[in-house]
């Protein structure tokens, strides 16, 4: 699928299977999400630009590769997006963090925005927007609309699960933003949930309903 990368690493798929199980506890779900987010982050950042820097090892000077440019921004769509942040920050602790408060109205399935906080210079940084689920796509589209309004243009979207309907909506709205996901499931049900999915990621992560 154009513009969409499915991260099918065996460890990602193994952990995702355990997360899908309805009997998986809140604590286990949260731990697995942190672990899987590290693996997903590894894949979504594999083509970052590098530059050479002169350093000194205990034995001699050398030219060695280092990340080029300003630090990354991880933009979390609240609240479930925060579950992906911990593992990603373990891997890239110097990253800046943005929070975008968007929730889906369960009657209209439309996004409702209530919070936005991001570095002032986001136009100069690569932004990785994170949300475990790309269902209808409405919340992620609204979040990226907001980032673009603030000048962001180098954006990637990372999720755990995606529905074909959400991918189609997202790609129509933001064809310039690549999507990275661990799996593309069958469809959305009448309530807008991904099927077979894993339930409501935020509720399973925080033990709420």
Swiss-Prot record:
Q: Where does 5-phospho-alpha-D-ribose 1-diphosphate bind?
A: 79, 104, 131-139, 200
Biological process (GO) annotations held by this record are:
UMP salvage; uracil salvage
Checking SUPFAM superfamilies in the record gives: PRTase-like
One of its Pfam families is UPRTase
Q: What is its EC number?
A: 2.4.2.9
Keyword Transferase present in the record's keywords: the answer is: yes
Q: Which Gene3D superfamilies match?
A: 3.40.50.2020
In what way is its activity controlled? Answer: Allosterically activated by GTP.
For the keyword Metal-binding, the answer is no
Which InterPro entries does this one have? PRibTrfase_dom, PRTase-like, Upp_B, UPRTase/APRTase, Ura_phspho_trans
Q: What residues does uracil bind to?
A: 194, 199-201
Q: In Gene Ontology terms, what is one molecular function of this protein?
A: uracil phosphoribosyltransferase activity
Q: Report which reactions are catalysed by this protein.
A: UMP + diphosphate = 5-phospho-alpha-D-ribose 1-diphosphate + uracil
Q: In which pathway does it act?
A: Pyrimidine metabolism; UMP biosynthesis via salvage pathway; UMP from uracil: step 1/1
Q: Which cofactor does it need?
A: Mg(2+)
Q: How many cofactors are bound and how? A: Binds 1 Mg(2+) ion per subunit. The magnesium is bound as Mg-PRPP.
* Membrane-crossing residue ranges in chain numbering: none
Q: What does this protein do?
A: Catalyzes the conversion of uracil and 5-phospho-alpha-D-ribose 1-diphosphate (PRPP) to UMP and diphosphate.
The family this protein is said to belong to: Belongs to the UPRTase family.
Classification via PANTHER family = ADENINE PHOSPHORIBOSYLTRANSFERASE (PTHR32315), URACIL PHOSPHORIBOSYLTRANSFERASE, CHLOROPLASTIC (PTHR32315:SF4)
- This chain belongs to which protein, by name? Uracil phosphoribosyltransferase
Q: Taxonomic lineage of this organism?
A: Bacteria, Pseudomonadati, Pseudomonadota, Alphaproteobacteria, Hyphomicrobiales
């Amino acid at each position: 699928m154009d513009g969409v990368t499915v991260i099918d690493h065996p460890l990602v798929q193994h952990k995702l299977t355990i997360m899908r199980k309805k009997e998986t506890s809140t604590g286990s779900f949260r731990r697995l999400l942190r672990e899987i987010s590290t693996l997903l982050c590894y894949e979504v950042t594999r083509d970052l630009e590098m530059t050479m820097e002169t350093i000194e090892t205990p034995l001699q000077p050398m030219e060695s590769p280092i990340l080029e440019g300003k630090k990354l921004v991880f933009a979390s769509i609240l609240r479930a997006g925060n579950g992906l942040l911990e593992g990603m920050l373990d891997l890239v602790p110097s990253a800046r963090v943005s929070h975008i408060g968007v929730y889906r109205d369960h009657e209209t399935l439309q996004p409702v925005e209530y919070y936005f906080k991001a570095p002032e210079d986001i136009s100069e940084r690569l932004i990785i927007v994170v949300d475990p689920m790309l269902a209808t796509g409405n919340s992620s589209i609204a979040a990226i609309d907001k980032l673009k309004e603030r000048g962001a243009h180098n954006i990637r979207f990372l999720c755990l699960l995606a529905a074909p309907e959400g991918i189609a909506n997202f790609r129509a709205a933001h064809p310039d933003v690549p999507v990275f996901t661990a799996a593309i499931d069958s469809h959305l049900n009448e309530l807008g949930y991904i099927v077979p999915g894993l339930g409501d990621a935020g509720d399973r992560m925080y033990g709420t309903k």
